[in-house]
């Protein structure tokens, strides 16, 4: 009877298919080689629990997925599982989530922004629902500019900063909202300009605001903008180097950050190695505080980040230095690390939502794996290191990192053009976790490309192999046929590849000779008259009598005197 019950359904209708959620999530677990937990942390925990041999045998073959998740989760980072987002052809310089964590955006040096919908994402084969490329809509007036920074407001407006002088605002669907104005590059006084006159380097939204944002640029200014005022900025703050006059010399402002505890205060980093603090609405337009020689001059400070209480500032420079500053006593940094290499593009560092950790990506050294360092926020000691394999010959590096507190997921950008989102099944909610728990879609029989015949291939269309069989590929059937259709359309435009024959005559052209007077516009009247000249001479119809009475025509003779007298007498001239 047990065998009969297994084969015969106990109810009518279509049976719902059940899936093992743990098995679905296990597909995206990170291997144990991609983690390196600090040994000091392990030894201290093993002494507290002498009965547990988990940490002492972490390198053994009995290491399973649950232990993997426990190790990295105990550190405080939801990084036991990952989903990779491919698509960019160059370094991913910036990544960001929207406020609710339902949308994910990546920007790259390939000049494009990829928009990902995490609610409808296929975890095994993710594709962006939109790719923003400004040259697609305005190729004549817009050049090729890499994306330097993306930032989402509380109303999910995307602030996109390219390596030109105009900030751009998109909505959450990737549609253009507004392009802000640029300044007059021939005006030397930056206070009189209405926008940046040089490349923008960094920008961010004011905390808990969807109307005010800040940008910095190579024109030695920091500018505050209002989304409702697109023709000019609200305020301009000009960095004046010591020993120079206003407008005579310019030094780039490389990064900026708002103070969450004091929303009207912000900090800027300058190429001379200093960090300056400003106040919005100040009449003097001068910094209220300055940290000189925070980093080496002419190296650039790639990142500034405040703690939530506003007492600590994190700075990272291209001199491979990572420093934490106590703003209550800024004469000397609290701690620093100079052994973490800064990537050439991107290279930011952030505080965790608990303010206890710092995440900083770095460049691989003597290996093909890019490291992400998890540091203690105060001591800057390494608590864990996460490694990511490089899928290309480019030097592996983690170039961008962001953390969404609401869904508790971490996004990364790498030098090989891929982006990653880290999550934990127990600690994370929604986002890519829902995509990982979603079962794969049932495939149609035609999705098996090895047994599918492309109908258009019978006529020798492009994109197919011999005998009408579809080429072997790892793409889905719909994606393959879409690409094949694009190739066929491109081939049709080439007369040689498409083997176009010479165009024949139309039906009207064949019957035009039968229509009287159909070709009068194309005839020469002089040529038509001369055609009858010989006939008129041999057989004249109207002057035949003159051939007998006057065979030789006799014309009246005209002398020069008659011509001159006729010219002198205006009465003899014919009136027109």
Curated annotation (Swiss-Prot):
GO CC terms: Cul4-RING E3 ubiquitin ligase complex; nucleus; site of double-strand break
Keywords linked to the UniProt accession: Repeat, WD repeat
Intervals holding WD repeats: 87-126, 195-235, 248-288, 296-335, 393-433
Keyword Ribonucleoprotein: no
Pfam families noted in UniProt: WD40
The keyword Transcription is annotated on this UniProt entry: no
Organism: Schizosaccharomyces pombe (strain 972 / ATCC 24843) (Fission yeast)
Any one GO BP annotation for this protein: double-strand break repair via homologous recombination
Biased composition (Acidic residues): 59-73
Region annotation (Disordered) ranges: 41-78, 547-576
Biased composition (Low complexity): 49-58
InterPro entries: G-protein_beta_WD-40_rep, WD40/YVTN_repeat-like_dom_sf, WD40_repeat_dom_sf, WD40_rpt, WD_repeat_GAD-1
PROSITE patterns, A to Z: WD_REPEATS_2, WD_REPEATS_REGION
Protein name, as recorded: Uncharacterized WD repeat-containing protein C343.17c
């Amino acid at each position: 009877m047990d065998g009969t019950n297994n084969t015969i359904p106990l109810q009518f209708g279509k049976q719902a298919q059940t899936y093992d959620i743990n098995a679905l999530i296990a597909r995206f677990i990170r291997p144990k080689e991609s983690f390196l937990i600090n040994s000091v942390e392990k030894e201290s925990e093993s002494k507290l629990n002498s009965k547990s041999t988990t940490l002492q045998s972490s390198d053994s073959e009995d290491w399973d997925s649950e232990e993997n998740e426990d190790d990295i989760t105990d550190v405080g980072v939801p990084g036991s599982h990952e989903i990779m987002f491919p698509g960019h052809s160059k370094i991913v310089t910036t990544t960001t989530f929207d406020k609710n964590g339902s949308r994910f955006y990546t920007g790259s040096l390939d000049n494009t922004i990829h928009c990902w919908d995490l609610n409808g994402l296929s975890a095994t084969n993710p594709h962006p629902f939109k790719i923003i490329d400004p040259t697609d809509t305005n190729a004549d007036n817009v050049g090729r500019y890499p994306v330097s920074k993306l930032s989402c407001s509380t109303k999910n407006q995307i602030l996109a900063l390219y390596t030109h002088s105009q900030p751009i605002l998109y909505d959450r669907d990737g549609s253009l909202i507004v392009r802000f104005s640029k300044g007059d590059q021939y005006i030397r006084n930056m206070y009189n300009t209405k926008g940046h006159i040089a490349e923008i380097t960094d920008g961010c939204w004011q905390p808990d605001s969807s109307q005010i944002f800040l940008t910095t640029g190579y024109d030695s200014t920091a500018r505050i903008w209002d989304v409702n005022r697109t023709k000019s900025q609200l305020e301009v703050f000009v960095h004046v180097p010591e020993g120079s006059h206003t407008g005579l010399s310019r030094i780039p402002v490389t990064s900026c950050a708002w103070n969450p505890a004091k929303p009207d205060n912000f900090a800027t980093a300058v190429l001379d190695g200093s960090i300056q603090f400003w106040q919005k609405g100040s009449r003097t337009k001068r910094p209220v505080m300055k940290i000189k020689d925070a980093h080496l001059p002419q190296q650039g400070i790639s990142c500034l980040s405040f703690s939530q209480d506003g007492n600590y500032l994190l700075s990272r420079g291209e001199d491979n230095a990572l420093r934490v500053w106590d703003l209550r006593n800024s004469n000397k940094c609290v701690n620093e690390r100079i052994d973490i290499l800064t990537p050439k593009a991107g290279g930011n560092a952030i505080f965790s939502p608990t303010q206890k950790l710092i995440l900083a990506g770095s460049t691989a050294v003597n290996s093909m794996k890019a490291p992400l360092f998890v540091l203690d926020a105060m001591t800057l000691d390494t608590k864990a290191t996460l490694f990511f394999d490089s899928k290309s010959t480019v030097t592996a590096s983690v170039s961008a990192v962001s953390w969404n507190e609401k869904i508790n997921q971490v996004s990364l950008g790498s030098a090989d053009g891929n982006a990653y989102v880290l999550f934990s099944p127990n600690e994370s909610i929604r986002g890519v976790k829902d995509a990982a728990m979603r079962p794969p879609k049932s495939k149609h029989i035609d999705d098996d490309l090895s047994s599918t015949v492309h109908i258009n291939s019978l006529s020798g269309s492009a994109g197919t192999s011999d005998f009408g069989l579809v080429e072997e590929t790892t793409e889905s059937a719909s994606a393959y046929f879409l690409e094949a259709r694009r190739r066929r359309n491109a081939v049709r435009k080439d007369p040689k590849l498409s083997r176009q024959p010479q165009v024949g005559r139309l039906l009207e052209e064949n019957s035009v000779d039968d229509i009287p007077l159909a070709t009068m516009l194309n005839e020469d009247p002089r040529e038509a008259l001369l055609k009858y000249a010989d006939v008129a001479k041999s057989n004249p119809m109207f002057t035949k009598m003159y051939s007998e009475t006057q065979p030789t025509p006799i014309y009246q003779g005209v002398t020069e005197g008659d011509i001159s007298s006729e010219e002198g007498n205006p009465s003899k001239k014919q009136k027109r």
